[in-house]
Design a protein with these regions (language model features):
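Short hydrophobic membrane-inserting helices
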Residues: 1-13, 17
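Conserved non-transmembrane functional hotspots
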Residues: 20-170
Length: 170
């Protein structure tokens, strides 16, 4: 009977060890899978931000260019009439400004970096100020500030973009 008892105890101990090993392996596999899923989600978010920022650079460039054309049109009209910002924009330029501004606005709201979003909002406020100016001195100053700020925002986008590449796992 003693041999049978030892056999039974050995079988029970072996089964318990096997169950414990399976539980530990399952927990580790679940933890690894969870970590891999988190890394994948993080990389998808990083890729989305990279794509958004690259599109935003193009959109912002288009908006800056369109507003500069508005400034030049106002300048030409001022030379003819002596009044700043009183002439309506042509339909094509008006649409160009509208589409460029809309695209910049939509893309900027997708940006995760709060500082960058705030910087873009400040720039867009200066661009609006430039377009709405009714005085040549105000318009010239707004143009100078907006174009300088545009360069600064482009550099800020570049910094955020580079940080997203630097944050990749090797």
């Amino acid at each position: 009977m003693e041999a049978a008892l030892w056999g039974l105890l050995g079988t029970i101990a072996g089964a318990a060890a096997s169950i414990a090993t399976t539980v530990i392996a399952s927990r580790n596999a679940a933890r690894l899978q969870s970590t891999a899923a988190a890394i994948e989600r993080e990389e998808k978010a990083r890729a989305f931000q990279r794509e958004t920022l690259i599109e935003l650079q193009d959109a912002l460039h288009d908006e800056l260019r369109a507003v500069a054309l508005v400034y030049m049109a106002d300048e030409a009209a001022y030379r003819e009439s002596g009044a700043w910002g009183r002439r309506l924009l042509g339909e094509e330029l008006n649409n160009r400004v509208h589409v460029a501004g809309r695209r910049t606005l939509l893309l900027s709201e997708r940006v995760a970096d709060d500082d960058l979003r705030g910087h873009i909002k400040s720039l867009r406020a200066r661009l609006t100020e430039l377009q709405m100016a009714r005085d040549v001195a105000v318009a010239e100053r707004a143009h100078e500030v907006a174009m300088s700020m545009g360069i600064s925002v482009m550099e800020h986008i570049g910094q955020v973009l580079r940080s997203l590449y630097a944050g990749q796992r090797a």
